[in-house]
């Protein structure tokens, strides 16, 4: 289409277009993602020609508490307010989110039933859900032709009642919780989730949540990670594991590497009080050792034991307080403990050797006495026969 240049006078005047403007509902997802500047338009008033208000709007503004009609857009001049009103509006604007109703002064007065409208405003939640859809911003009605207040109130009331009926027909389970952005109920997304994974129980420390777009995911609070699939749904068993379905014991998992079995999935986090005993106990097979195991030599056999430690090992217990053990280093104490064990083993070895020598002496004496008795018996027999 061919466009013609506009003069400065035409540009400065707001365009008055015949017809009725219909507000397009914004998606809740886009409303949460867009900043308040894009949603509600600029808040700085522009210097334009002042439109003469009609008599009905003037009468309505005079009867109210200083609230301006909503069909005046941001193209008007700044409204004169008291300093107290300006401070109150600024505090509300800074403390509340941009999509919530600031105060009772910001609620449009053109609605036919103000009490029912305020009741619906209370449904506005943290994420800007169904309650905020009944609030009309001022900049939407820019350039709209002025009509008597009675006609606008009737049309707005019909529009509000229509949306109110739609909101009542919506299932309550489709709304989001007030505690989070992406937390929704499980009943509203039953057709989007996998019924096979819902039957499986979640391991301890796991929970289910949904994204803003309604996709289900799982949260592992033990490792602070998220996963798209159920932790027990995927059969990605570690190497050496096998899943066994038994009619007697049920379903359990066998670890062929460590020769053990358990009911808990190997990928699930281990909680001692929830772990059940394994149904099968492995009998380890005795394997023949072809090669002898090399044991390292004890370093204390060749170490030189200090004289004071030998004296301490033979001294009575009542003299233990003489040594100041707190002055020794931890590594030195470990070394001296090993040396004391070596002295103890040597003492035991000496005692065993002494007892063994005494036993050998007893056995030798018994053998000698037996031989003597036999010799005396033989000599006595020879004497008696002769």
Swiss-Prot record:
GO biological process entries: cardiac muscle cell proliferation; epithelial cell proliferation; hair follicle development; hippo signaling; intestinal epithelial cell differentiation; keratinocyte apoptotic process; keratinocyte differentiation; lung epithelial cell differentiation
A Gene Ontology molecular function term of the record: molecular adaptor activity
Effect of deleting the gene: Mice show progressive hepatomegaly with a 2-fold increase in liver mass relative to total body mass at 1 month of age and a 3-fold increase by 3 months of age. Embryos display unchecked proliferation and defects in terminal differentiation of epithelial cells.
Free-text description of this protein's post-translational modifications in UniProt: Phosphorylated by STK3/MST2 and STK4/MST1. Phosphorylation is not required for SAV1 stability and may increase the number of protein binding sites on the scaffold molecule.
InterPro entries for the chain: SARAH_dom, Sav, WW_dom, WW_dom_sf
SARAH domain ranges (all copies): 322-369
Subcellular location: Nucleus; Cytoplasm
UniProt KW keywords: Coiled coil, Cytoplasm, Nucleus, Phosphoprotein, Repeat
Modified residues (Phosphoserine): 95, 137
Listed GO CC annotations: cytoplasm; cytosol; nucleus
Entry comment describing in which tissues the protein is expressed: Ubiquitously expressed in adult tissues with the highest level found in testis.
Boundaries of every WW domain copy: 200-233, 235-268
Domain of life: Eukaryota
Modified residues (Phosphothreonine): 211
Ranges in coiled-coil conformation: 345-374
Quaternary assembly: Homodimer. Stabilized through interaction with STK3/MST2 or STK4/MST1. Interacts (via SARAH domain) with isoform 1 of NEK2. Interacts with ESR1 only in the presence of STK3/MST2. Interacts with WTIP and AJUBA.
Function according to Swiss-Prot or TrEMBL: Regulator of STK3/MST2 and STK4/MST1 in the Hippo signaling pathway which plays a pivotal role in organ size control and tumor suppression by restricting proliferation and promoting apoptosis. The core of this pathway is composed of a kinase cascade wherein STK3/MST2 and STK4/MST1, in complex with its regulatory protein SAV1, phosphorylates and activates LATS1/2 in complex with its regulatory protein MOB1, which in turn phosphorylates and inactivates YAP1 oncoprotein and WWTR1/TAZ.
Identification of the protein by name: Protein salvador homolog 1
């Amino acid at each position: 289409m061919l466009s013609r240049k506009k003069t400065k006078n035409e540009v400065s005047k707001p365009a008055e277009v015949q017809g009725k403007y219909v507000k397009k509902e914004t998606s809740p997802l886009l409303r949460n993602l867009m900043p308040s500047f894009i949603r509600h338009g600029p808040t700085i008033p522009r210097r334009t020609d002042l439109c003469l208000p009609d008599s009905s709007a003037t009468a309505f503004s005079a009867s109210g508490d200083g609230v301006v009609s909503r069909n005046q857009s941001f193209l008007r001049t700044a409204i004169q307010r008291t300093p107290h009103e300006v401070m109150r509006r600024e505090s509300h604007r800074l403390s509340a989110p941009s999509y919530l109703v600031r105060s009772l002064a910001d609620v449009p007065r053109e609605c036919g039933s103000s009490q029912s409208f305020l009741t619906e405003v209370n449904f506005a939640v943290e994420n800007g859900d169904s309650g905020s859809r009944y609030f009309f911003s001022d900049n939407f009605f820019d350039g709209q032709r002025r009509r008597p207040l009675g006609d606008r109130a009737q049309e707005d009331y019909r529009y509000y009642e229509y949306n109110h009926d739609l909101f009542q027909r919506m299932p309550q389970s489709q709304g989001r919780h007030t505690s989070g952005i992406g937390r929704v109920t499980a009943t509203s997304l039953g057709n989007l989730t996998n019924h096979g994974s819902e039957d499986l129980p979640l391991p301890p420390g796991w929970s289910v949540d949904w994204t803003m777009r309604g996709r289900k995911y799982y949260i592992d609070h033990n490792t602070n990670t998220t996963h798209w699939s159920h932790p027990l749904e995927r059969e990605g068993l570690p190497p050496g594991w096998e899943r066994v379905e038994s009619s007697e014991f049920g379903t359990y998992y066998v670890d062929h590497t460590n020769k053990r079995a358990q009911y808990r999935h190997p990928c699930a986090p281990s909680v001692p009080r929830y772990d059940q005993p394994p149904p099968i106990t492995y009998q380890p097979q005795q394997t023949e050792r072809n090669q002898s195991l090399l044991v390292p030599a004890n370093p204390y056999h060749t170490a030189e034991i200090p004289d004071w430690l030998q004296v301490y090992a033979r001294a009575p217990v009542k003299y233990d307080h003489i040594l100041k053990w707190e002055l020794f280093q931890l590594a030195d104490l470990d070394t001296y403990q090993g040396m004391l064990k070596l002295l103890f083993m040597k003492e035991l070895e000496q005692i065993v050797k002494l007892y063994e020598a005494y036993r050998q002496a007893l056995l030798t004496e018994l053998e000698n006495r037996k031989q003597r008795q036999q010799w005396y018996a033989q000599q006595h027999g020879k004497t008696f026969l002769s």
